[in-house]
Swiss-Prot record:
Enzyme class: oxidoreductase
Cofactor: Cu cation; Zn(2+)
Official protein name in the record: Superoxide dismutase [Cu-Zn]
GO biological process, one term: removal of superoxide radicals
Family: Belongs to the Cu-Zn superoxide dismutase family.
Subunit structure: Homodimer.
Cofactor note: Binds 1 copper ion per subunit.
Encoding gene per record: SOD1
Localization per record: Cytoplasm; Nucleus
Organism name: Gallus gallus
């Protein structure tokens, strides 16, 4: 069973930056690990966006990666975008990322390689905010930092 790896170097408005690693064994869940620094303390939305285009900063990455046309939700919800990874929590300006997700993949139709990882300014309400924006973005606010997810050496 082959192990696949990917990496994302996130940059944005100073001082927010980070490096995120992705690892998947066979068709198992993807382990997402890493660190993002320069954040305000608290929860920040953390999503895979549709395009690997950062020509106009993080805005050109498009919407959340959502090949099945579902509503925004939390990472444990059946009704969610593929790219909905919930929140990362910063303490002392640093978010230690440790997520395991069975919806994203490093191969096939849910493949995130070549797409953009984004950390947002505000907490993701996981689609439970009671308004239209909640069902699209989780009201996570502006994009603080982003980077294209690329294949890494195994």
């Amino acid at each position: 069973m082959a192990t696949l790896k990917a990496v994302c170097v996130m940059k944005g408005d100073a001082p927010v930056e980070g490096v995120i690693h992705f690892q998947q064994q066979g068709s198992g869940p993807v382990k997402v690990t890493g660190k993002i620094t320069g954040l305000s303390d608290g929860d920040h939305g953390f999503h895979v966006h549709e395009f690997g285009d950062n020509t106009n900063g993080c805005t050109s990455a498009g919407a959340h990666f959502n090949p099945e046309g579902k509503q925004h939700g939390g990472p444990k919800d059946a009704d969610r975008h593929v790219g909905d990874l919930g929140n990362v929590t910063a303490k002392g300006g640093v978010a230690e990322v440790e997520i395991e997700d069975s919806v994203i993949s490093l191969t096939g139709p849910h493949c995130i390689i070549g797409r953009t990882m984004v950390v947002h300014a505000k907490s993701d309400d996981l689609g439970r905010g009671g308004d239209n924006e909640s069902k699209l973005t989780g009201n996570a606010g502006p994009r603080l930092a982003c980077g294209v997810i690329g294949i890494a050496k195994c």
